Amino acid sequence: MIAQSRNHKWLQQHDEAILEPELPIIDPHHHLWDKNTNHLVQPRYLLDEILEDINCGHNIVATVFIECGAMFKVGGDEHLRAVGETEFVNGIAAMCESGIYGATKVAAAIIGTVDLTIGALAGEVLDMHLAAGLSLIHI
């Protein structure tokens, strides 16, 4: 089920013309989350929702996921919990690579987060992000 934003009716008031429908576009910034009851606009924004947004007539060929504090691990070492978000998003990217969801490569690149105030442990976190994101994370 596709979740609608709290301002869905407002967003639907105007259609914007697609100016260059053949122009390949990479969406450089989006987030994915679920069950975020504190979110002001939309408590859920996952693959179904982003596909609905990007399949609007533009030629969105890929997207870049930016960390947003979602899907962190609840257990294990505190400094490694953010790696859960990379693992989750890498799964979304793998779904898109299958081709079942269309041609757009959602989360073709992932920007994760590391608390750099943890000193030498930051290197371990970066290594774990690289392992979890396979080829999608670059340092």
PLM feature spans:
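An N-terminally biased module of ancient metal coordination in phosphate/nucleic-acid-related enzymes
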Residues: 1-102
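Extended hydrophobic secondary-structure segments that form protein cores and membrane-embedded regions
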Residues: 64-67, 108-114
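Glycine-rich anion/phosphate-binding loops
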Residues: 117-126
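Glycine-rich, aromatic-flanked loop segments that form ligand/cofactor-binding clefts
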Residues: 129
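A short, hydrophobic secondary-structure junction motif
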Residues: 28-31, 114-118
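Conserved small/polar residues in nucleotide/adenosyl-binding loops
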Residues: 138-139
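Acidic, His- and aromatic-enriched active-site or binding-groove loops in soluble protein domains
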Residues: 132-135
